[in-house]
């Protein structure tokens, strides 16, 4: 694959860098004959990657974020002799869940912002962290596997999580994301026709 030729239509430098990383992972997967993964991509990057890969008819990849409606996903590039079923059996090799269980007095205190803020405050890269599923009693933080131990060790250094129980779980053990629906009635005046 000629990287420069494939990227010529993209103007933004960030887009080129993101797609260049994806091309590199796909090439490494082909030449080495093994699975390669990117860091987490945000929703824009996921959309960009999907359109780029479809346009260039590249099929040996899977976008995965830990659960069906995840916003942040990794791109898993695999050799031609692998199937998606073979990849699905190995998801736990790519992603882990760092589970934070709060104490009784801390339950309900923290939002997504608090968890993400803590990770950023520790100086850890956002690209290594996927979705953060927040619940009343804590959160499940999806991370790339090699990052799980680091996060488990560093989170208790933050005052807000010093009394929390922090464990590393398999990606299959992630809690279901709670979807809250609120009905709102809005009355809108319309212009009179008379």
What are these regions (language model features)?
Residues 1-194:
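Non-catalytic terminal extensions of ATP-dependent helicases
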């Amino acid at each position: 694959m000629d990287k420069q030729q494939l990227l010529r239509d993209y103007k933004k430098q960030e887009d080129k860098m993101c797609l260049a990383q994806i091309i590199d992972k796909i090439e490494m997967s082909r030449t080495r004959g093994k699975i390669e993964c990117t860091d987490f991509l945000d929703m824009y990057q996921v959309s960009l990657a999907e359109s780029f890969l479809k346009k260039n008819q590249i099929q040996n990849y899977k976008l995965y974020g830990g659960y069906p409606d995840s916003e942040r996903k990794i791109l898993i590039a695999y050799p031609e002799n692998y199937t998606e079923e073979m990849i699905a059996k190995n998801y736990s090799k790519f992603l882990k869940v760092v589970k934070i269980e709060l104490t009784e007095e801390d339950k309900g205190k923290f939002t997504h912002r608090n968890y993400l803020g803590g990770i950023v405050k520790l100086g850890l890269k956002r690209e290594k962290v996927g979705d953060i599923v927040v619940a009343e009693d804590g959160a499940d933080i999806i991370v790339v596997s090699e990052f799980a131990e680091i996060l488990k060790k560093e989170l208790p250094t933050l005052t807000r999580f010093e009394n929390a129980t922090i464990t590393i779980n398999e990606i299959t053990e992630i809690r279901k994301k709670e979807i809250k629906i609120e009905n709102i009635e809005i009355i809108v005046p319309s212009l009179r026709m008379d």
